[in-house]
Structures are given as C-alpha cells and as structure tokens.
Amino acid sequence: HLLEGSKEGLKLSGTNNTVANNIISAFDSMGIYLTYGSEISVSDNTVSGSNHFGIYAFTKDSAYSGNRVSDTCRFDNLGITGVGKYWFSGSGVYVEGNDNTIEHNRVIDSGYNGIQFAQRNVVQYNFINNACLTKDDGGGIYTSSSAAYPGAATNGSIIRHNIVDGVTGTLAGWSKWNIPYGEGIYLDTSAGGVTVDHNTVANCTANGIYLHDSYNETVTNNTVFNTKSGLLINGDLGGTSISKNLIYALARDIGDSQTARLVSRSGGPITINGNTYVAHYKSADIFRLDVTNYSFAGWKSQTGQDATSSCDLSALGAGESEALFYNTTMSNKTFYLNGAVATRVDGQPVTGSFDLSPFTSVVLTGTGLTKISK
C-alpha cells in the first residue's frame, strides 16, 4: 500500500513490465506514472485521491485492465500544485501512444475526464461514473488529435461496450456559459477515424455523444438516455456516419434548463440514418439545425437525414415512468420485475424478469419500475 506523497505514487518506464494489485492513495500528483514504454501490463490496481491524474501513461502496445480509479482531482483534496499544469489535468485515466487497450476499469468520481486517450487505442468494457466534478467542458470518455485534418492520430481507435453514467460539469470559476458542459463521449478537435459502438451514456448535463470539429467517425448501436442533447455534431469535417442508435430524451435536460433535444447539428457533411428516437413529452423543438429547432418531420425535411429512422412521440400512460437499467459486470445479470409492469422501447412487454449481457443496457417504460431488482 503506497500512501500519500507530494509527487507520484509509482513511477516507471521500460518494456515488459507489470504493475499489478497495488493500492495507491492520496498522492498530490499522479497515482501511477508511466513515462514511456511498451508491452506493459497495468492491472487490478486501486488508485484513489490523486490530484493531477489517477493513471498517467505514455506507452504503446500496453494493457490497462481491471483498475479502480477514484476521487481524482477532487476540489476539497487539492494541494499546493492544484490540478496540475496541463489543460487535461484532472482526468482519472490518461493514456497517450498507439495500440494500447484500456478495458474493464472502473473510473469513479473524476475531477475532469474519466478516461482520456490520445492516438490510436481501444477503450472497451469500462464503467465511468461521475466525471467533470471539478472542471468543465470534458467527457466521460474524451479524445482529440494533435495532428490536423486529414491525418488524425486517433484513426483506427475504437470506443465500445462502455457505460458512462453521470458527467456533471461545473460553473465554478467560469461564468461565460450559463449551464455546465459535461459530455458523455467527446470526440474533440481533429479527432478522426474513431468507431463509437455499443456504448451506454446517461445523465449528462450537456450531450450524450459530442462530435466537435472531427471527421470520419462511425457512431453505431449506442444508447443515450437523459442528456441535454442526445447527439451534438458541431463542425464535422466530413465522412461521419451515425446509425442504429437509441436516443432517448426526457422532459427536460438534467439541469432543467431547457427542453431535452434528440439531435443538434451545426455544419458538416454527415450521414444520419436508421436511428431510434424517443421523446414522450414534446414533439416540437426536439431537433436543432444551426440555430433553429424543429420537429422530427421538420428536421428530416430540412436536413435530408434520418429517412429510415423512427421517432416515438407518444405520451406515457397514467402513472407510467421510464428508467434505464445496465450491467457493468463481466457476467450476465438477471433483473426481476417484482410486480412492476414494463415494456421495452420496441413495444414488447417484459414478463417476470429480463437478462442483460455484460456492458449492455435497456430502457423500460411502465409502472412500479423502482421495484425492479437484480
């Protein structure tokens, strides 16, 4: 057990090293710092209370798996060096380099991004809960590229089968915006060639999936629930395809600042089609193109997008509510209704119980949903 210090808990470089089964607590800088190396295994470590980064690494061909990283960059814990010197300081896990795999980690209560990566990497089967608690304009999972269009360093990256629940953002110390900006999955400036597939994103103050000045992204089979806007595409540079996603809006955004929207788009030659949209509370102003809000029909007419997509605008029945259920383990889980009456998004009723495979989710509507247990 490595406990407290003014710098790093563990600092390492080299090749074919293993960092496993350590408990690292309350270091002012980084919990684990890998300055360079390849074929390194970082697994099953518990890192808590680091102020700059939980895990901070510059590696290639390495694996980060089964780690629990929590309470990174929490305001009340900050020391004389604050959050660190970089704009991206405060992230739970930061990995830079090619061909790393970041999987099966639990990243809880991060001051800035939950998981941030640079260059070509695979991020899969992670649970990110509560990010951007100290800093704003970040994401549960975040990437960008230092190499400009069209040579994105992120090309070939995959973000799949992750669950992101709770990205709050904060207005403390920043008054330009009226609402906090916590993004679920955030592909930022010049990120390109990233596949975002089969993720679940919920409870974000800003957008579930945010594409900002990026390009050639493939966004498929994701579930987005309870965000300001399910998808935001801002200045896409072209080649992006968005399909087969479930975007589910509640009555108001999580901060109760506006009507929740399904898709917002500002510029960019993209393809959006074959998605499932749900908005039980309002049919107007749930899509946005540049500065104008539209209904689903108006959106399709103005953009030519979503020709084969569906949008459920039916009102909930008396006493009905909606809820998201997910499985963050690597085993199948059975959920029991215990008297609840529940229906899936496709209208199929649930009887008795339902199963969820690892890192999958389901949205149910009905009565008595709080009775459901596993």
Outline where the language-model segments fall.
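Right-handed parallel beta-helix
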Residues: 1-4, 16-29, 38-53, 60-83, ...
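Extracellular beta-strand/beta-solenoid scaffold signature
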Residues: 4-10, 26-34, 49-56, 78-94, ...
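Short, solvent-exposed coil/turn segments
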Residues: 40, 86-88, 100, 136, ...
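Acidic, glycine- and Ser/Thr-rich low-complexity intrinsically disordered tracts
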Residues: 236-373
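Extracellular, surface-exposed repeat architectures
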Residues: 93, 101, 108-109, 136, ...
